[in-house]
Curated annotation (Swiss-Prot):
GO terms for cellular component: cytoplasm; ESCRT III complex; late endosome; multivesicular body. Belongs to the SNF7 family. This is Charged multivesicular body protein 1. InterPro entries: Snf7_fam. Probable peripherally associated component of the endosomal sorting required for transport complex III (ESCRT-III). It comes from the Eukaryota. It comes from Dictyostelium discoideum. Keywords: Coiled coil, Endosome, Membrane, Protein transport, Transport. It is a peripheral membrane protein. GO terms for biological process: endosome transport via multivesicular body sorting pathway; late endosome to vacuole transport; protein targeting to vacuole; protein transport. Residues 7-35, 102-125 form a coiled coil. Signal peptide: none annotated.
Length: 192
């Protein structure tokens, strides 16, 4: 199973590299698109635009597949850990049976202590695995933070994404809130 885990992780890394190559190719196609537009070559521009879109989609597909393979690798890694814990617990149970037959109370106590430690380790690993699985299968970043970051990046580059995002805050609302707060502050200052 360790070999399969290695192969999964290796494949995921390869797909991530392919995704980056496709991103670079997309950027190159966009540069060619810009040059074609500047030269008035609209047929060429259309071809470069199609190529850029295809490369972008290919990059996203590679990234999605890499993410899915990472999730599978995480599950395989969990199975390997559980197999190890299960093997340890099986050995402890055998030791318990042997001690019970001999009725050696000291050995029974030692085996029970060891069993309890293994069981606690299993609980800790189960919680860790459950958290890791939740992180790989759900989106943990709140949507409002994602929208805010998109808006910030768009503003930095002078891009307009207000129409594309329904939840992006408008500057008028932010300005209104600022004006209201300023007025309240001024009134409080005047009272004192």
């Amino acid at each position: 199973m360790e070999n399969q885990l290695f192969q999964l992780k290796f494949t995921s890394k390869q797909l991530e590299k392919q995704s980056k190559k496709s991103e670079q190719s997309e950027k190159a196609q966009k540069i060619k698109l810009k040059k074609a537009i500047e030269q008035g070559n609209m047929d060429g521009a259309r071809i470069y635009a199609q190529n850029a879109i295809r490369e972008k989609n290919q990059s996203l597909n590679y990234l999605r597949l890499a993410s899915r393979i990472d999730a599978v690798a995480s599950r395989v890694e969990t199975a390997i850990r559980m197999k190890s814990v299960t093997g340890s617990m099986a050995n402890i149970v055998k030791s318990m049976e042997k001690s019970m037959r001999n009725m050696d109370l000291e050995k029974i106590t030692q085996v029970m202590d060891q069993f309890e430690r293994q069981f606690e380790d299993l609980d800790v690993q189960s919680v860790y695995v459950e958290n890791a699985m939740n992180q790989t299968t759900t989106l943990s970043t709140p949507a409002d933070q994602v929208d805010l970051l998109i808006s910030q990046v768009a503003d930095e580059h002078g891009l307009n994404v207000g129409m594309q995002m329904g939840s992006a805050p408008s500057e008028k609302v932010q300005q209104g809130e600022t004006d209201e707060l300023t007025e309240r502050l001024n009134r409080l200052k005047q009272k004192n």
